[in-house]
Amino acid sequence: MFNFKPLLTITLLAVSSVASAAEQALDAQQVAQLIEKADCYRLQDDSSKVVSLVRLYQDQELDKTRLYHVYTRPNRESLVVFKSAVEAGQKMLMMGDNYWLQMPKSRRPIRITPMQKLLGEASIGDISTLTWSQDYQGEWKATETLTINGQSIAAYRLALTAKTKGASYQKIDLWLSEQDAFPIKADLYLRSGKLAKQAQYGRATNRGEDYVSEMTLLDSIQPSKKTVIEYQEIVPWQLDNKFYNPSYLPKANTSEL
């Protein structure tokens, strides 16, 4: 159970690749195990409540913030409740490959895609999906060395390819720590093959357990902007089944969620 502020943020400063002719490629099963372990740093319980604060920075100055409560459960199902005053009454439901957005006073939800933007570079998919193993098939590419805060960290570079229609990205290049499979950074690609954004993952520790405290999203086209998704609270939570029904969204009272 997590209910605390991040203690440490990791920032990527430079990257250098070290290829070794003697390095051993990981097989599909080993890669799958690595991805599942990386998922555990992001979400430990299948059914959880995640309080996510999204901050948009312009030229290193805080520009806007938005708050979301995300209720996730197995089988790729999530309910996102918009908590900021400017978005009050909005809610989004993800059911597998399908996404619905409910606007205040609207009679029915509208279908959307996981790439619909919320704030800055943060999209619906970035908020509602906290795991990779269910949406992507992984492949080992190389063992590389990343230089982070002046320290060299050995990392596995994996290529993830979408295996579900509702996956936010078609392809992800993901770097995991060789020591403990903690996610370090990722390049996120659209179906067109275009690089959509880059992600960096912050590490924090509580009671001896490491977890992903935040995700920083960077856009190479607009380097003056960055979006930070901070996971302020992650707790086990069982939400009533009725909230995972798109037809219930218009009448669902989520003010207390």
Predicted segments, located by residue:
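Bacterial N-terminal signal peptides that target proteins for export
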Residues: M1-L8
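N-terminal signal peptide c-region/cleavage motif recognized by signal peptidases
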Residues: S16-S20
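Flexible, processing/modification-adjacent segments and terminal tails
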Residues: A22-D46, L53, L62, G96-Q170, ...
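Sequence/structural signature of outer-membrane beta-barrel proteins
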Residues: Y57-D59
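Mid-chain, structured segments of secreted extracytoplasmic proteins
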Residues: Y68-R111
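A short, sequence-level motif marking secondary-structure junctions
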Residues: V70-P74, G96-N98, M115-L119, G202-T205, ...
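Gly/Pro-enriched, hydrophobic low-complexity segments
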Residues: I112, Q151-P246
